Amino acid sequence: MGGHLDCYQMSPGAGDDGAGFIAMLEAVRILKEIGVQPRRTIRVIFWGGEEQGLYGSTGYVKRYVQDGEKKLKEHAKISAYFNSDYGPDKFRGIYTQDNLQVYPLFEAWMQPFKDTGFTTLSNRSVGSTDLVPFDEAGIPAFQFIQDPMEWGRHSHRTQDFSDRLVLDDIRHNAVIIAWFAYNAAMRSEMLPRK
């Protein structure tokens, strides 16, 4: 799971993607705090060069997962990649990159959050974010859907300051990230691939 550390040249980057970074760190803290002993390793990675062309995630995939057509050692070990990169606002669902086989799993995983508005399961494929290299390598990769309240108005702009972050929304997102990572890591099988 991951997000990116870099931002546009003129943007402070609080929402894009500081909020995703914070949510990922908090998700890891939650899992550690409750003493999770996962069957599979939960790895969080923070990318550089996302805004300039997905350089960090592409380099990682090429070095450890798949180089061209050649599948590397990590390819068989990665069950899923969860990405948070669409601003600081509350999660409302998840994009599955047209991986329809995960629908029954994700519907069940989403149930505890139904009353919070986390209800949208979309087969839409999204791009221009760090899940793309994983998806292209055949790794199940997913982007959380967020309210566009602050992201659309301030992302990639000089107004992307931390005073616009709603910490309760970021905490909400962190709990969902932790839950999805936990469920993926506790499965005896890997998540279904397309």
Q: What kind of region is each of these model predictions?
A:
Residues 9, 47-154:
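Metal-dependent peptidase/peptidase-like ectodomains
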Residues 30-35, 75-79, 111-116, 172-177:
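Short C-terminal domain-edge/linker segments immediately following a structured domain
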Residues 29, 33, 40-42, 151-194:
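His/Asp/Glu-rich mid-to-C-terminal helical/loop segments that flank catalytic regions of hydrolases
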Residues 14-22, 36, 51-55, 100-104, ...:
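Soluble non-cytosolic domains of exported or imported proteins
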Residues 1-55, 177:
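Alpha-helical metal-binding/catalytic segments enriched in His/Glu/Asp
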Residues 36, 65-66, 111-115, 182-190:
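Generic secondary-structure signature for well-ordered alpha-helical cores
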